[in-house]
A protein has these predicted regions:
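Terminal amphipathic helices with adjacent charged low-complexity linkers/tails
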Residues: 21-38, 43
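Gly/Ser/Thr-rich loops at beta-strand to alpha-helix junctions
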Residues: 6-16, 100-106
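General beta-strand structural signal in soluble alpha/beta enzymes
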Residues: 2-5, 33-38, 96-99, 123, ...
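Small-residue-enriched flexible segments
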Residues: 106-245
Length: 245
């Protein structure tokens, strides 16, 4: 079992809270297994040292990160790639719980560790992490099956009311992307210029030709959060049967 971006953001408190949930289940069910916990949060002083050394670069059109930005941040995390997951797998972990992670990692790490093509494993992971939005009708809360092969992978929905088409799977390249042909991530980018989407059956699509292009240096994305205000929730109720009716 691999869990990434624990708690939805992957900061240290979210990881620790998720560890607590797992420990509670373990105690209730009397389970025994080896678990690896991977943190992704950085201390502020470490990040500021990297700024001073010129090791932090702007991501796209955003402004340069300043030390004042770091001071105002509550949490700063880095989006890890599959490498820490693979290391945990090699250590014999049965359950891996990680902080902020590149979304495909939970699907690609095991495959890459077993020698499958990195580009195809990551591309399949990018599709699977979005659930069934690549199917017709699309859904973010339904299941997809991915089958990774030597030179391709096949995706198909598990719900009989849905189907994958070459167009619906290819269209996923447009989802939350600035460029549908180049999908950057930790340590490099997926190159989809030569990717092919082949309709195998009414519900199955085979994907091939995707390449992984590593960057000269290994970069990870930093994400931070700062307090901008407070939110108050004030629930109210009434017992008046006339008003309720």
């Amino acid at each position: 079992v691999m869990i990434g971006t624990a708690g939805g953001s992957g900061a240290r408190p979210h990881v620790e809270e998720t560890v607590g949930i797992i420990e509670e289940i373990v105690k209730e069910k009397n389970l025994h297994f080896k678990m690896a916990v991977i943190q992704s949060e950085f201390e502020k002083e470490f990040v500021k040292e990297k700024i001073q050394k010129g090791d932090i670069l702007p991501l796209g059109p955003v402004a340069e990160l300043k030390e004042s930005d770091v001071d105002e941040s509550i949490h700063i995390v880095a989006q890890m790639g599959e490498e820490p997951f693979i290391k945990a797998l090699e250590s014999g972990a049965n359950v891996i719980l990680a902080g902020r992670s590149y979304d495909p990692c939970e699907f690609s790490a095991l495959a890459i560790s077993k020698g499958f093509d990195k580009a195809l494993a990551i591309h399949m992971g990018k599709i699977l992490e979005c659930a069934a939005i690549t199917a017709l009708p699309g859904s973010g809360s339904d299941c997809m099956l991915g089958t990774l092969k030597k030179d391709s992978f096949v995706v198909e929905p598990l719900n009989p009311i849905r189907k994958c088409t070459a167009l619906s799977v290819a269209a996923h390249s447009l989802y939350e992307k600035s460029n549908p042909y180049v999908l950057p991530g930790p340590g490099g980018a997926l190159d989809l210029h030569e990717t092919k989407f082949n309709q195998l059956s009414d519900t199955q699509v085979e994907v091939s030709g995707t390449k992984f292009v590593p960057t000269e240096e290994y970069f990870v994305k930093l994400e931070g959060v700062r307090r901008v205000g407070y939110r108050t929730m004030s629930p109210a109720a009434t017992h008046d049967p006339i008003m309720i009716s």
